[in-house]
Amino acid sequence: MTDHDERTFVMVKPDGVQRGLIGDIVTRLETKGLKMVGGKFMRIDEELAHEHYAEHEDKPFFDGLVSFITSGPVFAMVWEGADATRQVRQLMGATDAQDAAPGTIRGDYGNDLGHNLIHGSDHEDEGANEREIALFFDDDELVDWDRDASAWVYEDLADHD
């Protein structure tokens, strides 16, 4: 990982898994120039769901969130790249799929607010990436590796410091 890279947590939710969209979503993230450093196909139990959505615990939709995220398998991932969190959020599109722009994951594949296919760490919450990554992955499950194409995707950011 370079000084300019960051890691971000991304999850294909049960609706995206059931609709067979894991490959399409991974392809979009890779095509953007991001690099997967961890991936796990798994089921989320209620305890993990409560931890993951703890900030929504007092909201009226909390029980529905927990019920949905535990309803089927998910594909949890960690991605790395320059400004990775912001890039993922842009690719995802608006939270409500009906408001998401065409060309975004939710705009192209999503149906509504409750079935919006994908979760990504909040770019406005500085601790969200580390917290979510640690919740779903042990350090030894993340792989440091160099992609030979990085020089073809990003200009040398060191020249701009």
Curated annotation (Swiss-Prot):
Cofactor annotation: Mg(2+)
Entry's localization field: Cytoplasm
CDD domains registered for this protein in UniProt: NDPk_I
Annotated residues for binding of ATP: 13, 61, 89, 95, 106, 116
Gene3D superfamilies, A to Z: Nucleoside diphosphate kinase-like domain
InterPro entries: NDK-like_dom (IPR034907), NDK-like_dom_sf (IPR036850), Nucleoside_diP_kinase (IPR001564)
Keyword ATP-binding among UniProt keywords: yes
Cellular component, GO, one term: cytoplasm
Pfam family, one: NDK
Enzyme Commission number: 2.7.4.6
Active-site residues, Swiss-Prot/TrEMBL: 119
SMART domains: NDK
GO biological process, one term: CTP biosynthetic process
Catalytic reactions of this protein: a 2'-deoxyribonucleoside 5'-diphosphate + ATP = a 2'-deoxyribonucleoside 5'-triphosphate + ADP; a ribonucleoside 5'-diphosphate + ATP = a ribonucleoside 5'-triphosphate + ADP
GO terms for MF: ATP binding; metal ion binding; nucleoside diphosphate kinase activity
Domain of life: Archaea
Enzyme class at the top of the EC tree: transferase
Reported function: Major role in the synthesis of nucleoside triphosphates other than ATP. The ATP gamma phosphate is transferred to the NDP beta phosphate via a ping-pong mechanism, using a phosphorylated active-site intermediate.
HAMAP family: NDP_kinase
Family the entry assigns: Belongs to the NDK family.
Protein name: Nucleoside diphosphate kinase
Organism field: Halobacterium salinarum (strain ATCC 700922 / JCM 11081 / NRC-1) (Halobacterium halobium)
Gene: ndk
